Amino acid sequence: MKKIFDIFKIKKEERVSALVALIIACALNALTVIKYHSQFSQITDNYHKLFVKTFHVAGFDPLTYSIVSHWDTEYNVYRHPLLAFFMYIPNQINQGLIMLTGINCVQFVVGAILVFCAFYSFIFLYRIFREVIGTERFDANLLSAFYFSFAYVMVSAMVPDHFIMSMIILLCTLYITGVCMKKGRQLTIWQTILLFVFTAGVSLNNGLKTYLAALFTNGRKFFSIKYFLIGVILPAALMWGFARWEYRTFVWPKEMARHEAKMKKNKEATAKIYQQYRDSTGVKDSAKVEAAVKKIIKDKAHAKYVRDHKQIWNKNTGKPIAKGEFMNWTDKTTSRSQTLVENFFGESIMLHQQNLLGDVLRNRPVIVKYQSAVNYVVEACIVVLFLLGILAGRKSKFLWLTLTFFLMDAALHIGLGFGINEVYIMTAHYMYALPIAIAFLALKAKGKNLKWVFRGLMLAITLYLWISNGYLLAGYMLG
């Protein structure tokens, strides 16, 4: 057990950087507390309504606030099967604080979780650069600061959604497997199960990344009968079975209750239309009344259809590739080229000044353009550095593991179009591939002059991102 927690010990060379990272993580979360404390410290009987109606930072959901205030399985149980249960102890801590203080302390409880996740994400990324890739200390600090200057890495570290929780587990997975690769060790069954439970428990599709990491680390031994059955098949089956049980136990009864309430409401509304029609027209013939009421209901349905299609949430939702429970989440119509420029490599890294931190389901177009050419130049430089980094590290198995994580998300979001209209909110799931690839370029920058040209460019980009994103983010949260 002691060995498990050794990974959280801060090493001597990490202390100064760790302190800076901790201060920044606390400052980011302080902005969220300042913006919403007056509303979210209230005690209410409907926390879901309060948080969802009030919290507006891009497309992030404040469901964690809701669950930590009043425990329930509010997350989609198939996408986040264990996340609500991970939040049970924070919920109990918050209940104790509510009894002691008389206010809802949810922002402080969740804020502590977010600070922890952001802080150790920085630590694990720094260790990847130093211990796995082998960069110099200066470059490790610079590249870590570069990654945390990304707009939606900063935002993920301060909003009550699951993305920063996924990021710490994914970076921990990469760090552990990277060390195993370097030392010629294999990922054990218990390590695989533990990583899978946390990774898939928070976000089910990320569980596949655990198995990819194990495959890259263990090679052919990944398919040995004992490892594959106990470390792969068993936990995956149990996770899916648990998600199904969770749905039947917690979600299905609520859905049935809502369905029955809706049917009752529709029945009452239809009866009211019948009565109003008879009273206003004096028609007694039941067949004529039936036909007239059907027409009224049809006209109302059509009017609602027209109204809904004028709403921004409908305009910004693309058409699915096919119909189905999961395929309905896909998108075949949103422009991929514009998305790559403005959102995938754009908004994810640099905030747009227009429609700042807007929500595509409320008030933001899917595609927003930068007002200055400088933003596109910076974006192009980052993408070129990323590609050069891939070229420089093309022989590294660890880099290809990281890129597999990246490509898996690219296929999901850009290929299938899952969440493509707000792909930037998923930044924490995959964008760490950029600084990791660029780290291999740092290794290739030999010679004093070339090394400092590289460092100068990275430092300039990092400072620009911190100043630009920090200014816009602080302005939004304090405005």
Briefly describe each language-model feature range.
Residues 1-7, 207-236, 252-265:
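Perimembrane helix-loop-helix junctions
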Residues 62-108, 291-388, 400-402:
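Lumenal/periplasmic acceptor-binding loop at the mouth of the active site in multi-pass
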Residues 165-182:
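Specific aromatic-rich, kink-prone transmembrane helix
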Residues 125-149, 400, 404:
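Transmembrane-helix signature of polytopic, membrane-embedded enzymes
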Residues 158-163:
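Short acidic/glycine- and proline-prone juxtamembrane loop motifs at membrane-interface regions
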Residues 9-59, 66-71, 234-248, 461-466:
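Transmembrane signal-anchor helices characteristic of membrane glycosylation enzymes that use polyprenol
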Residues 187-206, 210-218, 230-237, 456-460:
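Membrane-interface alpha helices of multi-pass inner-membrane proteins
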Residues 112-133, 384-388:
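Transmembrane-helix motifs of polytopic, lipid-linked glycan transferases
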